[in-house]
Amino acid sequence: MTDRSTLDDAPAQADFIIAGATLIDGGGGPARQGDLAVRGGRIVALGDFAHAPGVPVIDARGLALAPGFIDSHTHDDGYLLAHPEMLPKVSQGITTVVTGNCGISLAPLSRRQIPQPLDLLGPPELFRFATFRDWLRALAETPAAVNVIPLVGHTTLRVAVMDDTGRAATDAERAAMRALLDEALQAGAFGVSTGTFYPPASAAPTDEIIDVCQPLRGRAGAIYATHLRDEADHIVPAMEEALLIGRELDCRVVFSHHKLAGERNHGRSRETLDMISRAAATQRVCLDCHPYPATSTMLRLDRARLASRTLITWSKGYPEATGRDFSEVMAELGLDDEAAIARLAPAGAIYFLMDQADVNRIFSHPLTTVGSDGLPFDPHPHPRQWGTFTNVLRTMVREQRLLSLETAIHKMTGLAAAQYGLTERGLLRQGYHADLVLFDPANVTDTATFSAPIQVSQGIHAVWVNGRQVWDGERTGAERPGQVLAPGDAIPWSQQSE
């Protein structure tokens, strides 16, 4: 860490200078031309200053420089260990990921038989951490290219403690989950996520969640992120439940991948966003989403029947279905939808469920951040894993002009940092950590599509994490400077002696 007393003699002692860039500071204000100097992983100067002889200078004329993007919703828990170069993320400008969403986290859980949807996080051998601290220690010992904001999953707690997740937890089981959660928070988790949409947690009543999550109460900046029980016909009572839980626990509610699923719910984002705005007047609340009108998760009958189109992303029961339309696979097998799902199971799918007008309206809300919600181990993933952030810059900024460039960057950086309680990140400020992305605003674009989803973005010229370059516009480097971040002003794991 660079001592603050050294800031005044920079940029003469800078490690490098990025010169002539359009500086978009992440706070939502107007862009300006200027230079930025980095030393010891920190921003030590920005604006108009003299360049000392011998300091490397990167010519950024015609390019934009912004804080590194924060992916507010990921399932990268296991991918960080298996693929620490994090190519799908750094190639689109992401420098920090929020893990443990939708109720599923890699830890605390050590077992070989992994039920859906936990298997979305990767193969069974990754589930080897009996405590949250064990997983964080592994990340600190073998760092990835990006920073990590860890959440602990309520579903993971249920699977770790209960012999039957198809019922409410007993008092003893609640106490055991509460103890695991307390350990996770003490180790460095920012909060809890739930996924009561999914069977391992759908039997959990509201009072169980409140009881288990009691360790959140009184923790400054604690997060309660939720994949709602219902994002379709019954979304309003599901949102009311989440807001109640947030009030009872006195913590921030994050509505994950906010959407209105199914044609009969298209247009209802006006109603749900109004609920969020009204709630924000009396409690801490925010939301995230991605720019696509399709979502992805395990293959389910209810989702397939709601969707206008279903695309199979993987299947253990019938691998030949991967990458194909579900309707085509049903015809090939001569089965109806219910029988075909049983034949393909376990499997994953992309569902075309949402209306683009709702997506745009949600994105425009002032409390919305950007979250890819990608499933990195899928053989044929949703393109959001590789292209969410550059898709926003192409479609919502440049083509549709739905958002100004400064507003889009604010949602990707400063707003997300504020909502998750990060200090000295998310903005271009002297003394802040040098998480940076240099890109061409006129040409930046996603190339990942639903038919060919594994493709790097174009127009991202360079990415730095904690002052070290992890992407040069064409390839990742050997650097793995990512840190496991800690809530508030706590010391990040990578700087702890233990």
Swiss-Prot record:
Catalytic activity: an N-acyl-D-aspartate + H2O = D-aspartate + a carboxylate
UniProt subcellular location: Cytoplasm
Annotated region described as Disordered, given as residue ranges: 478-498
Enzyme class: hydrolase
Annotated EC: 3.5.1.83
S-S pairs: none
A GO term for molecular function: N-acyl-D-aspartate deacylase activity
SUPFAM superfamilies: Composite domain of metallo-dependent hydrolases, Metallo-dependent hydrolases
InterPro entries the UniProt entry points to: Amidohydro_3, D-aminoacylase_insert_dom_sf, Metal-dep_hydrolase_composite, Metal_Hydrolase, Metallo-dep_Hydrolases_sf
Keyword Metal-binding: no
Cofactors demanded by this protein: Zn(2+)
An annotated GO cellular component: cytoplasm
Keywords: Cytoplasm, Hydrolase, Zinc
Gene3D superfamilies per record: D-aminoacylase. Domain 3, Metal-dependent hydrolases, Urease, subunit C, domain 1
Source superkingdom: Bacteria
Family as reported in the entry's similarity comment: Belongs to the metallo-dependent hydrolases superfamily. N-acyl-D-amino-acid deacylase family.
Protein name: N-acyl-D-aspartate deacylase
Origin species: Alcaligenes xylosoxydans xylosoxydans
